[in-house]
């Protein structure tokens, strides 16, 4: 069971909207209620709720400045990581080149660091311009990923909080992008592909 999955929730919303012939749906996760809106046949917007910046709810192992987390991973010094919870825990590092970091090597070390008692999702982000951000993501429990909805949410929030962007940003993954709007509540808009129906015998 996961706390929240942005991409998975968009897919579920697409199925519900199509099957019920409605323009919206409500999805209940273990810790949030997500409101979905069908923007078009191939686009879903999710209201992801508010981010949490409290160290106990991120959670962190101790009360430190969540906006300036410094970690030493082997010989690598990582500075000013910004930790938050957007349905699940994330840490975002803004760097000059997000793809120069070998996340297969350092991702699991950050994910399982003692600072993060419930482990953490890891994003290295790079400002492309005022409305576009590139990301390289290590997903908690999954590894290197081509896309992660909550990582996009976390990145959009952190960019705004650090005054690196406005409150409307496009988050670019290795494959595809998501639009994030942040005005106390996070809104994520992204594509959904055609759904294929399969049958599995259990």
PLM region spans:
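Active-site-adjacent alpha-helix immediately C-terminal to a catalytic or transition-state-stabilizing loop
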Residues: 152-156
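Active-site proximal loop and beta-alpha junction motif in alpha/beta enzyme cores
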Residues: 1-4, 9-145, 157-202
């Amino acid at each position: 069971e996961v706390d929240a999955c942005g991409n998975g929730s968009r897919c579920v919303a697409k199925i519900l909207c199509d099957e019920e012939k409605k323009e919206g749906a409500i999805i209940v996760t273990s810790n949030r209620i997500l409101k979905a809106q069908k923007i078009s046949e191939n686009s879903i917007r999710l209201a992801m709720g508010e981010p949490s910046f409290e160290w106990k709810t991120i959670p962190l192992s101790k009360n430190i400045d969540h906006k300036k987390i410094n970690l030493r991973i082997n010989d690598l010094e990582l500075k000013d990581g910004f930790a938050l919870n957007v349905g699940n825990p994330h840490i975002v590092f803004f760097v000059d080149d997000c793809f120069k970091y070998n996340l297969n090597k350092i991702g699991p070390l950050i994910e399982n660091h003692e600072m993060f008692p419930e482990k953490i999702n890891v994003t290295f982000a790079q400002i492309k311009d005022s409305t576009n951000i590139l990301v390289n993501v290590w997903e908690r429990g999954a590894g290197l990923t081509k896309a992660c909805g909550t990582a996009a949410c976390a990145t959009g929030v952190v960019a705004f909080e650090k005054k690196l962007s406005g409150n409307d940003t496009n988050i670019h993954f290795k494959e595809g992008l998501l639009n994030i709007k942040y005005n106390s509540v996070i809104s994520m808009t992204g594509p959904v592909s055609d759904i294929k129906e399969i049958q599995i015998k259990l």
